[in-house]
Curated annotation (Swiss-Prot):
Composition bias, Basic and acidic residues: 218-229
Family, as annotated: Belongs to the MgpC family.
Protein name: Putative MgpC-like protein MPN_149
Region annotation Disordered: where it falls in the sequence: 168-193, 215-267
Ranges annotated as biased composition (Polar residues): 170-184, 248-267
Lineage: superkingdom: Bacteria
Amino acid sequence: MAVGIFILSLNPSYELVDWKRVGDTKLVALVRSALVRVKFNDGTSSDSNNQDTNQNALSFDTQESQKALNGSQSGSSDTSGSNSQDFASYILIFQAAPRATWVFERKIKLELPYVKNESGAGDSTTTNSGSLYTTLQDLLVEQPVTPYTPNAGLARVNGAAQDTVHFGSGQESSWNSQRSQKVLKNNPGPKAVTGFKLDKGRAYRKLNEAWPVYEPLDSTKDGKGKDESSWNSSEKTTAESDAPLVGSTGSQMAAVTDSQQSGDNNGLVSLAQRSTTVAVQKSDSSGSQGQGTTDNKFQKYLNTTQALHQMGVIVPSLETWAGENKYWNRYPCCWWCFSPSSDPAIVFHKWRSTECNHPVIPYFNRPTRLLKWPDRCDGFERGTEFVVLGRGWANHVRKGYLMSPHRVELGHRQAEGVCGESAWFQWNQRHRLA
């Protein structure tokens, strides 16, 4: 991959982040500049002065980071060493060649730089160290016609290639018709960017649609998930009322981050379902969405933070959530130490396996962009450490799921092996704590 970066004349700071084989003939790689760093302000610090917690929540903490943002937004495609303004991230696509080699085919520039939380200038001076945003692991801003695009997965499910759906003679102007023919969700046109503009504004995700919904931040139509005409004052008011800003209280955050579903579907959907390919919420017996909280919030929308959790962008700490340490079990060997609160709590437990041969819970009932589920989660050696994710009441974990912690920490692009049981998770001799 270093050779590929050299050939493409990318800055020497570029590094390989992720890669994936696509069939036998394609190799897709994601590269980013190590100079691009990000820092967060979630509005919980004492000096926030009651400002809108969603304004300027994300900022780039180096000049190169800001250049990457400005360069990608300006549409500059010059990646030569002479132009240091461009530090955008790229999807690189390679074609298989004889003698087990890969030949560069094309690159796709991401709308915003791929960034991840790192220690850097300004990080040590922030007063909200250890807050929710410091747990951000990955930020992948997607664009159409990449293996990471939601519609790519939906199109494949329905037997159509992504480029066939998005592009072709007259298809851009007849997007609604094409979308309907391929039985895709109510997604925006082919030019819309599918990532959040995290550095400003407020964004929402509609629960019954597979694509994020954005509040338009300027006069442009493309690039906000919905055309401006579709985001009227009525929808904005409804979204703001249904998905209020979260940050004033940790307990409120805890109550809404894992959207409560009716029935027995109480797994960590926001953590386990790390794909925007399929984002259909389970319905209850009456046919409603079955979403929301006891105060009737988050019935139709998720705000920026919750939407990012659903998309798998923000990966919570394996020990804490929203900074409310007292509510979370930090002792892997103490399975009875759950939240004293009567409200459901998200709990994390370390578990060292004696065996891992349970049927895999089918979180995804169709192909997803980078997840391939085995029939059984064989292949993990005895003693492999897992993390149990589930809701906790009193002395048990309901609908516990097992996930290798190094997979969890890397986020949705790497989450390949999930073990679980279809019934209530019971601790017994076979399931031993570390």
